[in-house]
Amino acid sequence: METSSPWPPRPSPSAGLSLEARLGVDTRLWAKVLFTALYSLIFAFGTAGNALSVHVVLKARAGRPGRLRYHVLSLALSALLLLLVSMPMELYNFVWSHYPWVFGDLGCRGYYFVRELCAYATVLSVASLSAERCLAVCQPLRARRLLTPRRTRRLLSLVWVASLGLALPMAVIMGQKHEVESADGEPEPASRVCTVLVSRATLQVFIQVNVLVSFALPLALTAFLNGITVNHLMALYSQVPSASAQVSSIPSRLELLSEEGLLGFITWRKTLSLGVQASLVRHKDASQIRSLQHSAQVLRAIVAVYVICWLPYHARRLMYCYIPDDGWTNELYDFYHYFYMVTNTLFYVSSAVTPILYNAVSSSFRKLFLESLGSLCGEQHSLVPLPQEAPESTTSTYSFRLWGSPRNPSLGEIQV
C-alpha cells in the first residue's frame, strides 16, 4: 500500500523543518523528469494501442461472432481504464507534487478502487482465456460444444462483477487525512495526503489476501494451464509422420489459439489410425516447427510479462506493510521512495504491452491492427476482410486464424 507520499511519516517531526522534510519526501528533479518521460511514453503507446485494439474488435469484425474478441475487449478496456484514470493522478500527486492531495477523499478512494479493479479484471481475464485455450487444445470436440460466445460473455461478466467485489475493500481502507497538525492542534491543510486509514494489523491481512487473490493464485493457474496446453500440443505434434511417411501434409500454420485447428488435427489422427490416405496432411518441416515454437513462446511470454511487471509491485506492497515503523532507516526510506516509482512504472507497462501480445498471438489480428493503424495515419488502405473460406472439398486446406471459423468435419466423419 502507499500514500501520496510513499515514505511513511517520521515518528517525531520537528516543527522547525519544512513540511516535505517533516513528512520525509525528497524526490530529485532528475527522477521527476525521468519518470515523467517514462509515464508519457507508456500513456501514449498504451492508450493508442488499446484504443486501436478496441476499434479492431468492434469495427473490423462487426457482426461476426467469436469468443476471443470478448477476451481482447475485456483486457483492452481494463488497460484503458487504468491508464486514463490512474496514471494522470499518480503522475501529478505521487511524482511531482506529493502534498497536498488535491483530488479529495472521493478521488483518493476512487483512484485505488479503479487500480485494484483493473488489476483483478486483467489477471482474471487472462486466467479465463488460458482455461478456454487449455480446454480447446486438450478437448477440442468438447470445447466446440461447450465454449460458445454467449458463455464467454457470461464468464467475462462474472469476471468483472467479481473484480468489482474484490476491489471494493480498497475504497474503504484508503482515504484522505492530514498527517501534520499545527501548533494549536488544527490539521495543517498542506499536509493532506491519500493514505491508509486502518490499523497495521488490518492492513497486513488485507495485503496478504490481495497479493494471493490478485497475483499469486491467478498467475499460478495461468502458468499451469499454459504448461498443459503447450505439453499437449507438443505431444500431438510428435505424432506427425516424418518426411518419409506416405502422407501429404498437416496444416502449415498451427496456431495455438485455434480449437478449430486442433479439431482438424484430431480428425487427421483418427483418419490416419484407420490407414486411410490423409490427403490433407503435409510432411513435417522447419516452418511447421517454427510455428509451433512461436505459439509456445507466446504463451510463455504472457506469463513472463505479468511476472516481470507485477512481482516487484506486490513485493513493494508487502515491504511497506511488514517493515515496522522503527525499522525505517534513512537509507531504506530512500530506496523505497525510488523503488516505489519503478514498480508502479512496471505495473503500467503491463497495460501498454497487451496490444503487442495480441499481435504476437494472431497474424489475422496483426493484419487488421496494421490496416486500422494505416487508415488512421492517412494511408489509402481500407480494412480488407479476411479471405473467404474455400469451398468444401477433399483437397482444401485448413485456415488457422484467431477470428477464423474454418470448416471442420462433422462428428459422423471422424467416428472410428
UniProtKB/Swiss-Prot annotation:
Localisation: Cell membrane
Q: How does it sit in the membrane?
A: Multi-pass membrane protein
- GO terms of biological process kind: exploration behavior; neuropeptide signaling pathway; phospholipase C-activating G protein-coupled receptor signaling pathway; positive regulation of ERK1 and ERK2 cascade; positive regulation of MAPK cascade; regulation of membrane potential
Query: Which tissues carry this protein?
Result: Abundant in cortex and hypothalamus, and lower levels seen in the heart and intestine.
Membrane-side (Extracellular) residue stretches: 1-32, 88-109, 177-216, 319-337
Pfam assignment, any one: 7tm_1
Q: Name one GO cellular component term.
A: dendritic shaft
Membrane-spanning parts:
33-55, 65-87, 110-131, 155-176, 217-237, 298-318, 338-358
Which protein family is named in the record?
Answer: Belongs to the G-protein coupled receptor 1 family. Neurotensin receptor subfamily. NTSR2 sub-subfamily.
Designated name of the protein: Neurotensin receptor type 2
Q: State the organism named in the record.
A: Rattus norvegicus (Rat)
- What lineage is on file? Eukaryota, Metazoa, Chordata, Craniata, Vertebrata
Which gene specifies this protein's sequence? Ntsr2
